[in-house]
Amino acid sequence: MSRRKQTNPNKVHWDQVFAGLEEQARQAMMKTDFPGDLGSQRQAIQQLRDQDSSSSDSEGDEEETTQDEVSSHTSEEDGGVVKVEKELENTEQPVGGNEVVEHEVTGNLNSDPLLELCQCPLCQLDCGSREQLIAHVYQHTAAVVSAKSYMCPVCGRALSSPGSLGRHLLIHSEDQRSNCAVCGARFTSHATFNSEKLPEVLNMESLPTVHNEGPSSAEGKDIAFSPPVYPAGILLVCNNCAAYRKLLEAQTPSVRKWALRRQNEPLEVRLQRLERERTAKKSRRDNETPEEREVRRMRDREAKRLQRMQETDEQRARRLQRDREAMRLKRANETPEKRQARLIREREAKRLKRRLEKMDMMLRAQFGQDPSAMAALAAEMNFFQLPVSGVELDSQLLGKMAFEEQNSSSLH
């Protein structure tokens, strides 16, 4: 049975997405509009100024202290107050018609309830549109990820894609719920994270091309639009969302061409492509270091676990049937030496499993997440050093089997 990780045809190439959204992300980061009543914000800042003026410090010292706090980022509250204060000072510059523009902005923000959906939940920045919101929020996410993995800010687990990070972050949320940032669908479990849509949200004027994209089965579900839940402060975006897919197709033509080419390719071309991908993957794995190999295996196991959590009963039955057929074909063609080595490995795996079952639950979970601990436990049980190559492993297993047979015969 092949344990190779299969390629995902629905995977989004985030490098191409970020390249297409780079300009809009830059514009979103440069915007300075803050939702809410500017008058109330000015009153709050005036109260803070009155409190500070009662102290014995001078205004010059206060400005220097504020600048030091902003540069060092040691106080989030003072930094936010100074940021809003600077924005209000910019609005108070002697420019003609500035008060009229301020009233227009306040009126528009109060009159449009859907405009809050374009507000960043992390820095409260008004992005103006859904495209800019997506590009801006993933700038926050990119700050906590490495080149090959997306790190969870709560537990530090490395995940292979933003979609996997979003599904993983549902574990840390209190109510196990979240909303898609584009279509507004509420996800109540891991199985429905990429399936539920809200037709009312998809019919908004800001997304006119996505009319009636939502499934009719979602009408009987809970479609009450509530504020989104952002586990660990990360905004979640549904990878299979119809509205999000429309945005990606409109901004990255290469993604659309890639999907159409994969969908319409003949069987022979598909087999040749898969063979090329297997060859390239094998060459990459031959040149990787032991640390990279361990990280890749952990990432593959996590991705396979998440994939199996989302599969339906029919998909699971088909997968098990394929695995049984592949195992039957592989065992029919194996040599007696390979069969003997396989039986020994299965016996040792059962012994290791039984020993893990006798452990405490927390200790068992710790062993399951630590490959070095598993290797040490296996080495203690098998009486030889790990890791070793496949040929050495088979020879040592055969030698150990012969030694056990001699001991059993001498005892009898």
Swiss-Prot record:
SUPFAM superfamilies for this protein: beta-beta-alpha zinc fingers
Mapped zinc finger ranges (C2H2-type): 116-140, 150-172
Subcellular location: Nucleus
Major location category of this protein: nucleus
Coiled coil: 257-366
GO biological process: regulation of transcription by RNA polymerase II
Name of protein: Zinc finger protein 821
Taxonomic source organism: Homo sapiens (Human)
